[in-house]
Curated annotation (Swiss-Prot):
The entry's keywords: Chloroplast, Plastid, Ribonucleoprotein, Ribosomal protein, RNA-binding, rRNA-binding
Location of this chain's protein in the cell: Plastid, Chloroplast
HAMAP family: Ribosomal_uS11 (MF_01310)
Organism of derivation: Helianthus annuus (Common sunflower)
Protein name: Small ribosomal subunit protein uS11c
Keyword Zinc among UniProt keywords: no
Amino acid sequence: MAKAIPKKGSRGRISSRKSIRKIPKGVIHIQASFNNTIVTVTDVRGRVVSWSSAGTCGFQGTRRGTPFAAQTAAANAIRAVVDQGMQRAEVMIKGPGLGRDAALRAIRRSGILLTFVRDVTPMPHNGCRPPKKRRV
């Protein structure tokens, strides 16, 4: 019977595998739909540092689309990167949801200096036909 070959470096790790990087500047993406708000913090190259959404903060159902849920999600996403030394950030807001302003307010309150805020909501130049209106 073949013996199991021990893996190199499997005898207990002294430090964590992922080294904590110092990130002085980053990009905060806010995606606000009517049902949920997702906040993603990346470095300047686009690598995700931390993220949070209203769903991961414990809100369920229609409460995920509320401004308070968006505020909580933004605060959770930013708490991790402030510990890594982020001081300046750019903000990209996408979507028509209620959480746009609340998430931006939470970011401003966190103490990170915002270099600019840009609305990157995709707008059609009369592209596809929209779905038919609901009849209630």
